Amino acid sequence: MKASSSLPDGVQRRQFDNRSRLTTHGTTVYGEPRDTDGWRLWDAGRSKLGAMFKLDIETGLTGGESILYLGAASGTTVSHVADFAGPTYAIEFAPRPVRDLLEVATTRPNLIPLLCDARQPETYAHVVETDIEYLIQDVATRGQATVALRNRQFLAPDGKLILMIKARSEDVLSDPEDVFDTIISTLREGYIIQTRQRLDRFHDDHLAVVATPNM
């Protein structure tokens, strides 16, 4: 098991209910507890990236990086990301969650919510900077590998992709491991896979992938 030093600056393990829990420093977003020092609990059961940290999956994140986050929803995970990252572009296609994101961003000036479809990066290419250090994708749709390939254009040559693959969003009938293999095969058209690990302890039928662009 990796030591907690693998966590980015701005993410700490602190005591909640006499247990060591992941936290970031910031305002409460989804009803999570917050200690007297301003550190709020990061619930790995509600966040795939949080689950990756709990499972000691090495992401390479150190804190302060520029982020393009696809599938931001109402901000559960991306709010924690913005607590420790640099400029964080949050892409979400549904208007209702974006309204929540705008509220989250009021206390996080580095968080930039965008009402856009991650499958159509041309709709936000004029806003998102190039040479982004991390592309983090958590999109519940078919064609998850295609989304990652289309958004590779924003990554710096030495940037990284963190992809949460949801097997049931691709195919509800096939064995999840077969679905993962198919997606990984497509992903290799534009990425070099560094890590793949299932998240079943926290999220059924999900696979975490860390990759670098194959340029």
Curated annotation (Swiss-Prot):
S-adenosyl-L-methionine binds at T76, T77, E92, F93, D117, A118, D138, V139, A140, T141. Its EC number is 2.1.1.-. Residues 1-29 are annotated as: Disordered. The keyword Glycoprotein does not apply. SMART domains: Fibrillarin (SM01206). Keywords: Methyltransferase, RNA-binding, rRNA processing, Transferase, tRNA processing. Residues 11-20 have a biased composition (Basic and acidic residues). InterPro entries: Fibrillarin, Fibrillarin_CS, SAM-dependent_MTases_sf. GO terms for biological process: box C/D sno(s)RNA 3'-end processing; tRNA processing. One of its GO terms (molecular function) is histone H2AQ104 methyltransferase activity. Involved in pre-rRNA and tRNA processing. Utilizes the methyl donor S-adenosyl-L-methionine to catalyze the site-specific 2'-hydroxyl methylation of ribose moieties in rRNA and tRNA. Site specificity is provided by a guide RNA that base pairs with the substrate. Methylation occurs at a characteristic distance from the sequence involved in base pairing with the guide RNA. Interacts with nop5. Component of box C/D small ribonucleoprotein (sRNP) particles that contain rpl7ae, FlpA and nop5, plus a guide RNA. Belongs to the methyltransferase superfamily. Fibrillarin family. This is Fibrillarin-like rRNA/tRNA 2'-O-methyltransferase. It comes from Haloquadratum walsbyi (strain DSM 16790 / HBSQ001).
